[in-house]
């Protein structure tokens, strides 16, 4: 028996990337105007390109979500709504939003416009999902920090809400007060009120060195008052990386997410190359199709994403 097939949602930083995403199996793309969608660089979408993209997507029977997940300050609110009006007129399948004020304004100005809650809203529990459901949000893009079990519990608690999950791409280390440093060094989570202000410690960098058995140890950062508590700093031919998370790659969990009834599997990467968009769409398309038809996961897909 075939399973419900989740939507494969790919990033689009350009019309070319959008077309390749669809050609290689994406069901939908997400894109936005640079100043409204947290992607100022490597984003060629203006109003004309947005209109063309939405038109092409619908002609193919695909979906196009317009990203509007910026958190505007007072002096940007009217400008945001002004620039959003023509986008709504283009007929995107939904707006991706994060700010409660923007959600309220969209409801006032554009009643009936579907809205998906951005990952920027940091939705990490089923109670928050129910809250946003009551506000008229049609889909929740869950926080990228959630594990499989947590996603499953949310699905069970709120079975009638569309859930979207990031399965591939870059992971942010911190976002406005949601720092990871304290949790990394001494397991005191700032998001639970236990921050130790690790950002204010005095650090020293210890150079890479060869240990007693001939293995190279990476550059590490050490707090002067806490000897032995080390944070690695990776280096390669391109430079040094501090607080650089490894990318998310959850292709091996596609079957589990499909069985849970997750509605959409999302790939990060609106600033990535068209090749990246095409390749990731191709691999995740195969993983979804295999999961839906009951085929065992093919481990070779892991290496195709290296």
Task: Identify what each model region corresponds to.
Residues 126-127:
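Conserved nucleotide-cofactor-binding alpha/beta core module
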Residues 2-123, 141-142, 150-264, 271-306:
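Active-site pocket-lining/capping segments in soluble small-molecule metabolic enzymes
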């Amino acid at each position: 028996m075939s399973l419900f097939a989740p939507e494969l949602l790919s990033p689009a930083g350009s019309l070319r990337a959008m077309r390749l995403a669809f050609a290689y199996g994406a069901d939908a793309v997400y894109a936005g105007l640079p100043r409204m969608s947290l992607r100022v660089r490597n984003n060629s979408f203006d109003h004309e390109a947005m209109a063309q993209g939405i038109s092409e997507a619908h002609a193919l029977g695909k979906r196009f979500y317009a990203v509007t997940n910026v958190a505007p300050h007072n002096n940007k609110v009217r400008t945001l709504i002004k620039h959003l009006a023509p986008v709504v007129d283009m007929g995107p399948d939904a707006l991706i939003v994060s700010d409660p004020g923007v959600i309220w304004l969209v409801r006032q100005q554009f009643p009936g416009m579907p809205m998906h809650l951005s990952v920027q809203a940091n939705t990490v529990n089923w109670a928050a999902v129910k809250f946003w459901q009551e506000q008229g949000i049609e889909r929740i893009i869950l926080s990228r920090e959630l594990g499989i079990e947590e996603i499953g519990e949310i699905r069970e608690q709120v079975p009638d809400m569309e859930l979207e999950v990031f399965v591939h791409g870059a992971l942010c280390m911190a976002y406005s007060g949601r720092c990871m440093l304290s949790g990394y060094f001494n397991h005191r989570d700032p998001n639970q009120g236990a921050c130790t202000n690790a950002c204010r410690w005095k650090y020293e960098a210890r150079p890479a060195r060869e240990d007693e058995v001939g293995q190279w140890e990476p550059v590490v950062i050490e707090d002067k008052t806490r000897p032995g508590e080390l944070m690695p700093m990776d280096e390669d031919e391109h430079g040094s990386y501090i607080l650089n998370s490894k990318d998310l790659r959850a292709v091996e969990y596609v079957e589990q997410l499909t069985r849970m009834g997750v509605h959409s599997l999302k790939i990060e990467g609106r600033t990535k190359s068209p090749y990246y968009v095409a390749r990731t769409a191709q691999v995740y398309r195969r993983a979804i199709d295999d999961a839906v038809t009951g085929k065992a996961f093919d481990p070779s897909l892991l290496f195709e994403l290296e």
